[in-house]
């Protein structure tokens, strides 16, 4: 296992609890004589920290590992910036859900010590890359760890579009939108729209229509290396939007083409050795526990 010496810290702004956890984490890492680098936005709200700082974009070039303190949204943003550097990412949960940031604040020192001592698991999570083209020219690009979503924006009208997979026409749809999700994103917006849960190790993409105006519109799971094209109808009078992880947004025009495919670089997500995906689902999604309260 890799030995981590240069540790970056990213923290969600606007939370007293996050700042408290970042301070604890900083003290813990310094006590282990590690080199700590703060992402510049969190460094600004920690006066007198005395540490090296870096932009998020450059953090992956100077760190062996990056620890994100916040919720899943914080880790999504970090993942898009860090995946291209192949730097491992560890999450400490200070959000409401914690599918990706799975270390609780009360176990920070114990779990981080295990990871730093070489006792951890690594999952490679792939991202999607999306490109919006108008008259053959790219007008917007974005990456997503969870999902790429076509939606009406501020309009309440349905969107008409065609779907192509690997150059083959699949169908036309009239719906509130379309969600294209990774296995990581299958437990996010896609799940709320009726999509299936996909194990993170699957090399697959799920396409989930949002309230389609048909009884036969259903999610479809395709190979993870597929290239998906969504063509917005030229007859549309509204300008829908494309959102990547709900954080980056692009406005489309009638006739635009949205291309979605797997990004070459992957996120290296670190978990403690006792991480159990099904336990996470059971806890976060309210699945039933063992019958009778026991048994192996």
From Swiss-Prot:
NCBIfam families from the UniProt entry:
PRK01231.1 (NF002306)
Q: Which GO terms describe its biological process?
A: NAD metabolic process; NADP biosynthetic process
Q: Which cysteines are joined by disulfide bonds?
A: none
Q: What does this protein do?
A: Involved in the regulation of the intracellular balance of NAD and NADP, and is a key enzyme in the biosynthesis of NADP. Catalyzes specifically the phosphorylation on 2'-hydroxyl of the adenosine moiety of NAD to yield NADP.
User: Which GO-annotated molecular functions does the record name?
Assistant: ATP binding; metal ion binding; NAD binding; NAD+ kinase activity
Q: Which reaction does it catalyse?
A: NAD(+) + ATP = ADP + NADP(+) + H(+)
By what name is this protein known?
A: NAD kinase
Q: Which domain of life is it from?
A: Bacteria
Required co-factors: a divalent metal cation
Q: Does the keyword Magnesium apply?
A: no
Q: Name one Pfam family in it.
A: NAD_kinase
Q: Which family does it belong to?
A: Belongs to the NAD kinase family.
Q: Which InterPro entries match?
A: ATP-NAD_kinase_N, ATP-NAD_kinase_PpnK-typ_C, NAD/diacylglycerol_kinase_sf, NADK
Give the EC number(s) listed in the UniProt record: 2.7.1.23
Q: Which UniProt keywords apply?
A: ATP-binding, Cytoplasm, Kinase, NAD, NADP, Nucleotide-binding, Transferase
Q: Which GO terms describe its cellular component?
A: cytoplasm
Output the Gene3D superfamilies linked to this UniProt entry: Probable inorganic polyphosphate/atp-NAD kinase, domain 1 (3.40.50.10330), Probable inorganic polyphosphate/atp-NAD kinase, domain 2 (2.60.200.30)
Active-site residues are 72 (proton acceptor)
- Subcellular location per the Swiss-Prot or TrEMBL entry: Cytoplasm
The gene name on file is: nadK
- Give the residues the record marks as binding NAD(+): 72-73, 146-147, 157, 174, 176, 187-192, 247
């Amino acid at each position: 296992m890799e030995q981590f010496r240069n540790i970056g810290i990213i923290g969600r702004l606007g939370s007293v609890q996050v700042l408290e956890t970042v301070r604890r984490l900083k003290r813990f890492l310094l006590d282990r004589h590690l080199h700590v680098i703060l992402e510049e936005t969190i460094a600004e709200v920690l006066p007198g920290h005395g540490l090296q700082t870096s932009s998020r974009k450059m953090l992956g070039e100077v760190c062996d590992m990056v620890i994100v303190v916040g919720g899943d949204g914080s880790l999504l943003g970090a993942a898009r910036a860090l995946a291209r550097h192949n730097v491992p990412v560890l999450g400490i949960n200070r959000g409401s859900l914690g599918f990706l940031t799975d270390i609780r604040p009360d176990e920070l020192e114990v779990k981080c010590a295990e990871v730093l001592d070489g006792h951890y698991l690594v999952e490679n999570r792939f991202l999607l890359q999306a490109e919006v083209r108008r008259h053959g020219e790219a007008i917007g690009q974005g990456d997503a760890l969870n999902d790429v979503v076509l939606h009406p924006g501020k309009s309440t009208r349905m969107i008409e579009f065609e779907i192509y997979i690997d150059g083959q026409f699949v169908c036309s749809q009239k719906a509130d939108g379309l969600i294209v999700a990774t296995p990581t994103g299958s437990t996010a917006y896609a799940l709320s729209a009726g999509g299936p849960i996909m194990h993170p190790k699957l090399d697959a993409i799920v396409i989930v229509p949002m309230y389609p105006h048909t009884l036969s519109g259903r999610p479809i799971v395709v190979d993870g290396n597929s290239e998906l094209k969504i063509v917005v109808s030229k007859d549309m009078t509204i300008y829908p939007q494309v959102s990547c992880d709900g954080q980056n947004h692009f406005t489309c025009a009638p006739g635009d083409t949205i291309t979605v495919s797997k990004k070459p670089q992957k996120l290296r997500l670190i978990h403690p050795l006792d991480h159990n995906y099904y336990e996470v689902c059971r806890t976060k999604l309210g699945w039933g526990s063992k019958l009778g309260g026991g048994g192996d």
